[in-house]
Amino acid sequence: MKILLAILLSVNFLTSHPLTGQANMSVLVKNLQTGEVIDEYRSDKVVPPASVMKLLTTGAALEILGPGFRFPTLLEYTGTIENGVLKGDLYVRGSCDPTLGFKGKTAFLDQWVKAIKAAGIQRIEGAVIADMTMLDGEAQNPGWLCEDAGNYYAPGIFALNYYGNTMNIVLQSGAPGTVAKVIKTEPYVEDICFINRVRCGKITYDGAFVSGLPYSRERYLTGAVPSDLGTFGVKGDLPNPGLLLARHLTNRLRDGGMKVANEASYIADYNPLTPPRTELYTHYSEPLSEILKETNVNSNNLYAESLFRYLGTRYTLPGTIHNSQDLLQDYWRRRGVSVQNAIIKDGCGLAPQDAISAKTFVQLLTIMSSSPNKDAWMASLPVSGQTGTLKSLCAKTELEGRIHAKSGTIAGTKNFAGYIDMPNGETWVFAILINSAPGKARNIQTVIQQYLLGLIKEN
């Protein structure tokens, strides 16, 4: 009986379980106060972290920028204002803010209109132009899978993000064998072109997919949906969110009685010789501490990748993906985290080439536990059985509400890294990374939950 209990209450439970025994694993559990190793299995081995990767990005952003940092978005103009007429163009200069228009909240545009009118502008002889030059033109991370491009969870990342870089495509299902009809997009995207091959069939699930590339007006709709379903929505990415923002601002100005001579446009190529502009107004995002909650609690890829790309601009302009990769690697190495074998392709964990060890995550989490920004850090992590992506983990068990951690999920993979508040007052720091397991992620989570519950009983 004691032998069986020991197997259940150690990492041997994971290595001997039929679901996880042959998986690619890296595990480390330590006492945060004493540094004692509670359990360990190949903790130096790098494996795909999935969304646990967001800990590297959000931790670096919090430490470098501070919890009170706010993304600025500038309204600027060229030319002069004469007798209420702007003889030039109005620019919206982005700096990677992921919050603009998120969840359809566009009331900030009314404040922008007020600021423009307060500057004495009654008519614009030029256009509203989206300035997306802070980043290079590589909006889609090359490490992401081709089949992810165009999906809502893998949107392009721009210096001007808007509406969560996501649109809802409303389709209408018909008789079996027919093609579902595209009704509209929310928000409306005037020049988008759908190549629609979504078939209606005698199925019970929604199997429609969206694909396409940043800046391209074409979006491919494929797959199948239940027949005679009525209208339903399929989420995809916005091809050019900055341009959509410029169009929406143009419409608000015109709706308010202001004449704007030309249609909205955008610039994406950085030019260090760009003539200076006159600053008219600066819009600030909510504080970084709030942005991190959306990033980690809801595992928002747009938010994480925007932070990742913004950090890269600290090296040079325009910001590049390579700069962002180097910054994360360099920053955590300077902080004493073992990243020499880490592979960092993106900031959100969507790239399958990402590879991080359990040891790296535990070192990072240990550093953050004593940071001056600890409160903001802990508030950004979902809580077991209660919030976000941890809502189903250890619910209605003795560990409900005691785990603050980030999860990561892809096919055959379930990862967790964070903190456990023990009943005796101790805090454990842990990383459990299980990849290539022959089963569904929810079943892998059940095994991990059994392991964690057994581990605390042993200790």
Go through each PLM region and give its residues.
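Small-residue-rich helix-loop
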Residues: 38-40, 298, 305-459
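Conserved serine DD-peptidase/penicillin-binding transpeptidase domain
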Residues: 64-339, 457-458
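Sec-dependent signal peptide recognition
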Residues: 1-7
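Short Pro/Gly-enriched beta-strand edge/turn motifs at strand-loop
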Residues: 9, 13, 188-200, 397-404
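Beta-lactamase-like hydrolase cores
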Residues: 7-46, 65, 71-72, 112-120, ...
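Short active-site loop at a secondary-structure junction
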Residues: 40-60
